[in-house]
Amino acid sequence: MSKFQHDVMLRIVKILNVLMIELPFAACWFLYYSHQTYANLAWEGHFAILGLFFILYIALGKIYDAFWMSMQRVSELVYGQILGAMATDGILYTVICLMSAKFCNLLPGIAAIVGQLVMAAIWASCAHKWYYKTFPPQKTAVVYDVRHGMEKLINEYGLSQKYDVQVTLSVSECLADLSILDGMETVFVSGVHSHERNIILKHCVGKGINMFVIPRVGDVIMSGAWPMHMFHLPMLRVGRYMASPEFLFVKRTMDIVISLVALVILSPVLLITAIAVKSDGGPAFYKQVRLTKDGKQFEILKFRSMRVDAEKDGVVRLSTGDKDDRITKVGHIIRACRLDELPQLLNILKGDLSVVGPRPERPEIAAQYCEEMPEFALRLQAKAGLTGYAQVYGKYNTTPYDKLQMDLMYIAHPSLIEDLKIMLATVKILFMPESTEGVSEGQTTAMSGENH
C-alpha cells in the first residue's frame, strides 16, 4: 500500500469518527434545541450549526489526541474524544443559549454526551483493531550512542504493534555499514552527536526511511531558528528568547482575564478547600520561594498538602506520591484533583506567573541542576507558568533533562495558539494518575522541590 492510500484510508476512518460523535448532537439539536431559538432557521442555519460542530470537534480532537489511533490505547482514544466532544458541546450550548436569549435545558445535552460516549467507545475499539489488522508493524531499527531504553519505551507504551524493533546497534556499528538500515521503515536515533547523526539522516532520507531523533538541548534551540538570507546565502538566526512586545502584551492580558474569571468562578471551591486544609489546625496556605524570568525570586502560593513539620530538619525530600506519609488526608484529595495549585491564580494576577510557561523551580534545586547541566538556566528566559509543555507532555517523574528540553521547545516557539493548546490539553491530564506519579527513592526530577 502506498503512503497516499495509507493517508486516505486514515482520513476516511477519522471523518467517520467525527460523524459518529456528531450524530447524538444532531439528534439533540433537531429534536429539541432547534425549537428553542427565537428564529425559525432555514436549512442553511441547521447546516451552519452542524458545520460549526464538525470544525470545532476536529480542532479540539487534535488537541486531545482523539484521532491518534496508532499511538493511543483504546481508553486514551475514548478519553480524548469525550473531552473534545464535551468542549464542543459546551461551545455550541453557549451559542444556542445566545440564539434563544435564555438558559436552555441541559438534560438533552447530557443525553447527547452519553450517546457520544457510546459512539466513542465503539469507534475507538473498532478503529484500533482495524488499524493493526490493516497496517502491520513497521520494521524498525534503534541506533544509539548513549542508550535511552527505546525498546523498553516502545513496549511500555504499547507500541510494539506499530514498531517491530528488528535491529539495535551502536552508532559506530551503524556508520561502519549503513546498509544495515536498508529495508527498515523507521529508525530511532538516540544520544547520537550531530555529525554522526547527519550521516545517518542523509542515508535515511535518501532511502525513504522515517527517522525519529531524540534531540539534545542544542537541537531544540536550533529548532526555533529564524530562516533568512544574507550575503546571498541561506542562514539561520539563533538567539535568546525575545518575544515581541505585542505578543507579551496580549499574553499578559490573557493572564489577567483568565486568572480573574477563574478566581470568581472557583471562589466557592477555594473557600471550601481552605476550610478543609485548616481542619488539622495548620495554615491553609503554603508559601515557597521560586524562580521566574531572569532568575527573579517570588513566593509561590499553594494550598498546604503536607504536615506543617514536613521539612522540620531543613532537608528537602522528594515526594513519593501516595506513599509519602507527610501528605495529609486532605492533601491526598486536593493533590489528586490539582486543587492545591489553585491559589497560584493570585500569583498570575500579580504578575509573578503566567498561565503557560516553564514551572518555577526552587533556587536551591535550580542551583543544583545548573551544576550538573548548565543549560538548565535557559529555562529562565521566559516567565514561569501555572502549566506548561513539560507538564502536559511529560510526567511528574520525567527526568530533569527531558523536562528541560520540553520547556525549551516551548520557549523556542512562542505562540498564543500554542498557549491555548497547552491550556486546553491541561484539562486532559487533570484526571490522569500517571501525570502525578511520585518518584522512587533517589530519583530526582525537575519538580522535586515541590513538596507542598
Model-flagged regions — what are they?
Residues 375-452:
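C-terminal terminal-structure detector
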Residues 1-132, 452:
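Signature of alpha-helical transmembrane segments in polytopic membrane proteins
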Residues 81-85, 89, 253-261, 337:
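Loop-to-transmembrane-helix entry motif
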Residues 1-24, 125-264, 437-452:
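N-terminal hydrophobic signal-anchor/signal peptide
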Residues 320-383, 422-430:
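A short, structured surface patch at a secondary-structure boundary
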Residues 81-85, 137-152, 283-306:
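Membrane-cytosol interface motif
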Residues 247-310, 347, 416, 422-452:
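A hydrophobic, helix-centered structural microdomain
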Residues 218-219, 286-326, 386-405:
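Short, glycine-rich, amphipathic interfacial segments at transmembrane boundaries or analogous
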